[in-house]
Amino acid sequence: MTDIMTDTQKDTAAGAVPTRSGFVALIGATNAGKSTLVNRLVGAKVSIVSHKVQTTRAIIRGIAIHGSAQIVFMDTPGIFKPRRRLDRAMVTTAWGGAKDADLIMLLIDSERGIKGDAEAILEGLKEVHQPKVLVLNKVDQVRREDLLKLAAAANDVVAFERTFMISALTGSGCEDVMDYLAETLPEGPWYYPEDQISDLPMRQLAAEITREKLFLRLHQELPYASHVETEKWEERKDGSVRIEQVIYVERDSQKKIALGKGGEAIKAISTAARKEISEILEQPVHLFLFVKVRENWGDDPERFREMGLDFPK
């Protein structure tokens, strides 16, 4: 009988370091800093960030190489008490991502501590059997004595494999996280090409960037009542790209806010989004934004599919 060896086994037999790979789900309450941390660990912007809660709506995968390991980070929507259909879909997606991962990283905002949503997430993790690590974020804002108490309290509820204290904003402590993951993930071939940093299609990433600029520009409830889709993507002969996107809102009054006085708001959103998309593509971009009213788009299964979410019953 002939034994067949995988490439990884051949490398190991030859004395090379075996490759490792796996999926790491980042979960936590809204605005714990998950997207900022994913961007930091990947070394590039793969997930949009704003100061508003519920910015991340679907799982965004960011891919990092550390030594001989390929680490696929799953930036999940913040977990909170859902009130509407979209909320339920986001929370279900977050827990689903956790259960599909090789390892779970619970990110807790050290300034807020364990209360409300964070407390409920800890209780929920008792029913999830994947290995778990605790990551305390924003530790530069909290006394060490309080951090130790916070870590002890969380570990009293869930048996974490390790506890890390980091600042996603400055990068402090992040190298320790990467070292641990690179040593812990299972041996196996990489899932993605070495130069790939995300599995998000460019059309969807462009829509996410525009949605980020919408979040940053507009206030109150409008960002949560809006959705952005890329409807047209045309590569032009001169090397530029023409992109048409639609911002869906629920009411005429919201459309007026999105447009702004004399179109001021939509122009600012378009300029900021076009600049960033152009930098990512490394080619000129012509971005055209349209605002349309679609009542109850949050109850439309097609919109959920566009966002990468399952439509809850």
Curated annotation (Swiss-Prot):
Residues 20-187 form the Era-type G domain. Pfam families: KH_2, MMR_HSR1. The keyword tRNA processing does not apply. Monomer. GTP binds at residues 28-35, 75-79, 137-140. Gene3D superfamilies: 3.30.300.20, P-loop containing nucleotide triphosphate hydrolases. This is GTPase Era. Residues 28-35 are annotated as: G1. Residues 54-58 are annotated as: G2. InterPro entries: G_ERA_dom, GTP-bd, GTPase_Era-like, KH_dom-like_a/b, KH_dom_type_2, KH_sf_prok-type, P-loop_NTPase, Small_GTP-bd. The keyword Transport does not apply. Residues 218-295 form the KH type-2 domain. It comes from the Bacteria. It is found in: Cytoplasm; Cell inner membrane. It is a peripheral membrane protein. One of its GO terms (cellular component) is cytosol. Residues 75-78 are annotated as: G3. An essential GTPase that binds both GDP and GTP, with rapid nucleotide exchange. Plays a role in 16S rRNA processing and 30S ribosomal subunit biogenesis and possibly also in cell cycle regulation and energy metabolism. Keywords: Cell inner membrane, Cell membrane, Cytoplasm, GTP-binding, Membrane, Nucleotide-binding, Ribosome biogenesis, RNA-binding, rRNA-binding. GO terms for biological process: ribosomal small subunit assembly. Residues 166-168 are annotated as: G5. The gene is era. The lineage of its organism: Bacteria, Pseudomonadati, Pseudomonadota, Alphaproteobacteria, Hyphomicrobiales. Residues 137-140 are annotated as: G4.
